[in-house]
């Protein structure tokens, strides 16, 4: 059993290099496999899943902003593959680090904010005070709305990171307990299988939630 539970999230492989981050480049070889792989049940299921996802995103985005669907779908695939790859043995979980999730969330948020301020400045200022708010509370409403807009990339990043960390910690704890005896090892096997299935579902759900929130932010811009 490891002395530090969070050592599994350490990207360092030596004192000078963080080679674990190179696992992100594996996605470049996995993602375009449909261009050279022959049709199979897995490939057909994968394409059907992406088609359903693209339709869901299209329903949440205004017609004038449909050109953003492609980049949102790409972000979803990237996050999903990163989350699922982190469940494999000896593979570094990049999505469990804030530096990774902030790298995805902050540019989107900053782009939408700048676009709205440049093209729809009056509308942005008007949205800081919800319709029907008393005049006496308008100052506080502006502060609340401003803070809520500022923390959006933080909430996006922390939500994804926290869910990935919690799931991997549970898997690590359960696998560490199973090392004490053969009986615990046999008992923990079905629980480990169930937990891995749940974590796979969480990997999909968290990637979906991430891009759905981004699509909602696009509609507001």
From Swiss-Prot:
Domain of life: Eukaryota
Alphabetical UniProt keywords: ATP synthesis, CF(0), Hydrogen ion transport, Ion transport, Membrane, Mitochondrion, Mitochondrion inner membrane, Transmembrane, Transmembrane helix, Transport
Protein name (record): ATP synthase subunit a
CDD domains per record: ATP-synt_Fo_a_6
Family matches, as InterPro entries: ATP_synth_F0_asu, ATP_synth_F0_asu_AS, ATP_synth_F0_asu_bact/mt, F0_ATP_A_sf
Family named by the database record: Belongs to the ATPase A chain family.
Locations listed in the record: Mitochondrion inner membrane
Topology in membrane: Multi-pass membrane protein
Keyword Transmembrane: yes
Quaternary data: F-type ATPases have 2 components, CF(1) - the catalytic core - and CF(0) - the membrane proton channel. CF(1) has five subunits: alpha(3), beta(3), gamma(1), delta(1), epsilon(1). CF(0) has three main subunits: a, b and c.
Gene Ontology cellular-component terms listed: mitochondrial inner membrane; proton-transporting ATP synthase complex
Chain's role: Mitochondrial membrane ATP synthase (F(1)F(0) ATP synthase or Complex V) produces ATP from ADP in the presence of a proton gradient across the membrane which is generated by electron transport complexes of the respiratory chain. F-type ATPases consist of two structural domains, F(1) - containing the extramembraneous catalytic core and F(0) - containing the membrane proton channel, linked together by a central stalk and a peripheral stalk. During catalysis, ATP synthesis in the catalytic domain of F(1) is coupled via a rotary mechanism of the central stalk subunits to proton translocation.
GO molecular function, one term: proton-transporting ATP synthase activity, rotational mechanism
Bilayer-crossing regions: 24-44, 69-89, 98-118, 124-144, 169-189, 194-214
Statement: the UniProt record of this protein carries the keyword Amino-acid biosynthesis: no
């Amino acid at each position: 059993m490891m002395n530090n539970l969070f050592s599994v999230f350490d990207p360092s492989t030596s004192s000078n290099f963080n080679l674990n981050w190179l696992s992100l480049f594996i996605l470049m070889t996995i993602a375009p496999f449909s261009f050279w792989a022959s049709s199979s049940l897995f490939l057909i299921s994968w394409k059907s899943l992406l088609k359903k996802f693209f339709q869901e995103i299209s329903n949440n985005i205004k017609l004038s902003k449909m050109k953003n669907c492609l980049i949102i779908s790409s972000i979803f695939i990237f996050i999903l593959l990163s989350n699922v790859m982190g469940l494999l043995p000896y593979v570094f979980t990049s999505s469990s680090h804030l530096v990774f999730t902030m790298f995805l969330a902050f540019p989107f948020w900053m782009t939408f904010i700048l676009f709205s301020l440049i093209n729809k400045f009056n509308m942005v200022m008007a949205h800081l005070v919800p319709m029907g708010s008393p005049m006496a509370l308008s100052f506080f409403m502006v502060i609340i709305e401003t803070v809520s807009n500022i923390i959006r990339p933080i909430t996006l990043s922390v939500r994804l990171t926290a869910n990935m960390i919690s799931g991997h910690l549970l898997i690590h704890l359960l696998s560490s307990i199973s090392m004490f005896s053969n009986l615990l090892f046999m008992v923990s096997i079905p629980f480990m299988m169930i937990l891995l299935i749940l974590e796979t579902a969480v990997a999909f759900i968290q990637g979906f939630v991430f891009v759905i929130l981004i699509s909602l932010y696009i509609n507001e811009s």
